[in-house]
């Protein structure tokens, strides 16, 4: 969606998020299920997703997709955080200790960013909050300059 590669299977126009996560997810899955494994886009998406998950496992603390909580409390995985931070990881190209430190610092920045945290906890599925979340993520991607 952020890269403008998904196509709405009903309208054949670029898919846009309109505050209805069920509809958006359904259309995205229909689009993805139409791709053949030999398709270049399929291969690229598979590669990006795999790398993002490998980076998450390697660099994030245990429970890394959970929002901060009080000691002794364990919050569930936050899906909006999972999707947006995974998107950030999927866009980065880099290796080595310095790159890993940059990713970990970015993670910590986000955990202290009130606007980002608000977008993960209030009206999470609204278009306004979704766009705000990805605006913050895209700005960080640009600042990291590792694409």
Place the predicted regions along the sequence by residue.
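Flexible coil/loop and intrinsically disordered segments
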Residues: 1-147
């Amino acid at each position: 969606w952020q890269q403008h590669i998904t196509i709405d299977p009903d309208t054949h126009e670029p898919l846009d998020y309109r505050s209805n996560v069920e509809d958006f997810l359904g259309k995205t899955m229909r689009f993805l299920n139409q791709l053949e494994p030999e398709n270049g886009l399929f291969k690229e998406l598979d590669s990006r997703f795999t790398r993002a998950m490998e980076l998450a496992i390697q660099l994030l603390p245990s429970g890394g997709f959970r929002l901060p909580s009080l000691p002794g409390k364990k919050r569930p995985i936050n899906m909006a955080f999972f999707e947006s931070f995974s998107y950030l990881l999927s866009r980065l190209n880099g290796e080595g200790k310095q790159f890993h430190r940059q990713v970990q610092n970015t993670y910590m920045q986000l955990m202290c960013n009130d606007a980002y945290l608000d977008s993960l906890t209030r009206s999470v599925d609204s278009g306004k909050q979704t766009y705000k979340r990805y605006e913050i993520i895209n700005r960080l991607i640009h600042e990291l300059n590792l694409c």
